[in-house]
């Protein structure tokens, strides 16, 4: 427990120092831009094209999935009993994500959410899932969102979200739906942290 708490203190300090040197928006644009570059390079090398699917179907399915993911996330943060893993997710939001996202503007939330949805879905659902399969791609997605002690439960939750986004990509026959679901979910999560998280997450 002590080691876990140390990680949860050291990691936010590192993140805060990084954000002071580079704005979070700039980091997001660079990081997600690299993911897009890797995804398109891999796609070009493999001779495969990205399939985005129908617009109406993608939008509707994406919004519905975002609503489900957002509801589950809110339940974990506010309503769920303190089962194993739940307290660590709540601490991660309070001690890491609140300092990171707590002062974002509406424009920053929209842009960061959009580039995250595009970059991560192109790579994980557009490249890794066709190459490795649904489960391995979802596991890697979860691992990519872990950052030290105390983040295992959060990584498992993100892995589940990755699986749902992967199933959504298959069911909707394209990447548009998971991109929308991912972006809308991220926007809702950051908005919650920005305007309501300080009072609820503990």
Can you say where each PLM-predicted feature lies in the sequence?
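Cytosolic-side membrane-entry/anchor segment at the start of a transmembrane helix
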Residues: 12-37
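A periodicity- and composition-biased signal for non-globular, repetitive helical segments
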Residues: 10-11, 38, 131, 188
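Juxtamembrane helix-loop-helix connectors linking adjacent transmembrane helices
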Residues: 6-11, 27, 41-116, 199-202
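Transmembrane helix-loop-helix hairpins at the membrane interface
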Residues: 95-202
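Hydrophobic alpha-helical membrane segments, chiefly transmembrane helices and signal peptide h-regions
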Residues: 32-38, 65, 185
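Extreme N-terminal basic, low-complexity initiation segments
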Residues: 2-4
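Short amphipathic alpha-helical "recognition" segments used for binding
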Residues: 8, 36, 124-125
